[in-house]
Amino acid sequence: MGRKTQITKEIILETALQMLIRDGYGAITVKTLAAEIGCSTQPIVWHFENMNGFRKAFFEYCIDYAKSQFTVWNGSLDDLLTETARGYITIACNMPNLFRFVFVDNKDECKNSDVVQKLQLDNTKKIIRLLCK
């Protein structure tokens, strides 16, 4: 019977998110992430195989976190537009490193991300419905 994993993928991704928000993506390496968690580099390599695997999973994790910062709104078009803009502004002002990583530095990944498309589609569909009334 194998040992139970103590450093989970969730712990690694959450720690990396906090490092990103605090220090920016450039501060995140396998070694610095392991040091922040207080473990060897082995759990990170085991979960993600390499930095490319980590980056892909981390990008999706950051998108999910960014999405959680948007208010779900079912009111008027004006209110929906306001709340959507407020979500972007809140992230840009309060978590500029996260905003830069998700929406600026990774434009190509952002365009190809199903999660980002869903984030944009959720509000876009509501906006289109309200415009058609």
Predicted feature descriptions by range:
Residues 11, 15, 19-53, 57:
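Helix-turn-helix
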Residues 91-114:
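Amphipathic alpha-helical segments used for helix-helix packing
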Residues 109-133:
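Amphipathic alpha-helical packing segments from all-alpha helical-bundle domains
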